[in-house]
Amino acid sequence: MASINFTLTGYQILDRIYSGTRTLVYRAFRIDDKQPVAIKVLRNNYPSFSELVQFRNQYTIAKNLNLPGIIETYSLETYHNSYALVMEDFGGISLKEWTEERETGPSLMEFLQVGIDLSDTLDILYRHRIIHKDIKPANILINPHTKQVKLIDFSIASLLPRETQTLMNPNVLEGTLGYLSPEQTGRMNRGIDYRTDFYSLGVTFYQLLAGQLPFQSNDAMELLHCHIAKQPPSLHQINPEIPPVLSEIVSKLMAKNAEDRYQSALGLKFDLEYCLEQLEENGRIKSFAIAQRDVGDRFTIPEKLYGRETEVETLLEAFDRVSSDRTEMMLVGGFSGIGKTAIVNEVQKPIVRQRGYFIKGKFDKFNRNIPFSAFVQAFRDLMGQLLSESDEELKKWQTQILQALGDNAQVIIEVIPEL
């Protein structure tokens, strides 16, 4: 057992079972009743306000979910300048660790059993109006002996039925870039709902079956572009032993538009159970028409833009021209609520491909007394994106901005304080 320097009143610490960049997890038992527990703490001795909020968020959401498939949360203890989250310990290890410990990946039988259990869990979240937003192998625990599967880490989960992701630098986006749904990037002109978890589950399935992520890159912006616009190689191409219908199921989960994915976890579960039934009876899985039982019980209007193809095309053509070192300015006008913002937001997708920055400003009839209000709004947004870049990138921008502004720099700073 490794030496540990963590103590918490009322608990006997046994060993450390996880060490991440942000959190540490210890195995322990409660002294009062000898109950085995897992204790999660933040690695940072002086955590930021947002880290503390996320820690409380996962306790607040998970404490009321004493349900199969979701880790049970016992208490939130005060620990130094932070918190300690006390959860059940059912002898599980992360799915990531479970697959890494084996020379080969999970068998088809094991994969299907895990997939069916996770479908059940997503159905539970759906019925409780919870969006997890960070489904990945590291957040899925499995008991190596009983094969029981449980979902953990509700730190960025949401109780809202729908969210709008604001445009942010990829380095500070919520979630894990390799598993992020297109709408979670904030660059799809679409809101986030329960179907974002289906995409992340699809990436998880892909990794379990292929032994690799569908998109691999160390460049955050390139990863975003892949999630938004690129199709990964099909699982059947990577490994011919994977039945084509399983490849089809995973591809449907990973559809770019939410309305093209599965619309219910039970529809997904039915298909996986049928695959398992075939495998147990015949030793192989034949192709069949998937998603025949996939019916959502919520009325969801597709977030497509209708009747504005000409205007969107005009904007995209202008963007292609300015990508070749030209400068253009375009103004979009119209009455309130006519859809100006929706049209402008459509330009975000090609901007990611060209590694550009997307900023916008809106002239508001209630802010007519503020000169250049839309320009100020747009450039304050740009400064916010630049400030989350690396020090090296910031240095380049600092040099360029100082050269361009010269003696006028102080004047601009008074208008845009972030500068």
PLM regions: where:
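Conserved Walker-type P-loop NTP-binding/catalytic site
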Residues: 373-419
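Conserved short submotifs of the Hanks-type protein kinase catalytic core
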Residues: 80-94
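Protein kinase catalytic-loop region centered on the HRD/HxD motif
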Residues: 120-130
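Activation-segment/catalytic-loop signature of the eukaryotic protein kinase fold
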Residues: 76
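AlphaC helix of the eukaryotic protein kinase fold
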Residues: 46-64
